[in-house]
Amino acid sequence: PIRVIIGNPPYSIGQKSANDNAQNQSYPILDQRIADTYVAGSTSTNTKGIYDSYIKAFRWATDRLSPKEGSVIAFISNGAWIDGNSHDGFRASLQKEFDKIYVYDLRGNARTSGELRKREGGGIFDSGSRTPIAITILVRYPEGKRSDSCQIHYHDIGDYLSREDKLRLIKQTKTYRRLDWETIMPNEKNDWINQRDGFFDTLLPLVPEKKY
């Protein structure tokens, strides 16, 4: 049985052509699993990002691991899922399928501007990625020892840090046990950070909702 999967999944939802290195490939069975879990648990009307390759990697890895033995997934990936509204179903599924979750938010979102861009700091992969990056560790206990609720632990690397600053902090930390973890209590919308207050739901929609 497979008990540990470690990797750096590709990100391909923004692929511009078939000549791009990270091609969008069709995996019907995997896509259906995503539809049955991450999409089914979402309230978002825009689910395109849920079929990104790095999200597919999470689904694939989760389904490959042995439920009897207990297992761990450790990925460094696009971190947009942490607070993306369209990723609420993904976050909800992680809570159901794992007993402990550790998210080390390395920030670095280059698709921002002004003061927010400065706060995001440098990208871990430099010019290789414009997305925010996160290290995620998912722990699932063996059958019979599963917890009734998932413990979610979050650590933000900090504001205004250069790429070199971030790499130095990661190297100095050495182990996840040394980080000062914040325990996250998701709200009813399955927000983990930057939680919404529900005011938006009181507004009248301009067009009917539909799934894309």
Region annotations inferred by a language model:
Residues 51, 58, 75, 90, ...:
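Phenylalanine-focused residue identity feature
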Residues 37-38, 103-109, 114-115, 121:
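Amphipathic helix/helix-loop-helix segment enriched in hydrophobic residues with interspersed Lys/Arg
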Residues 77-79, 105-107, 140, 156-158:
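Active-site proximal loops enriched in glycine and acidic residues that flank catalytic Cys/His/Asp
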Residues 1-75, 80-84, 93-103:
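SAM-dependent methyltransferase catalytic-core segment centered on the flexible catalytic loop
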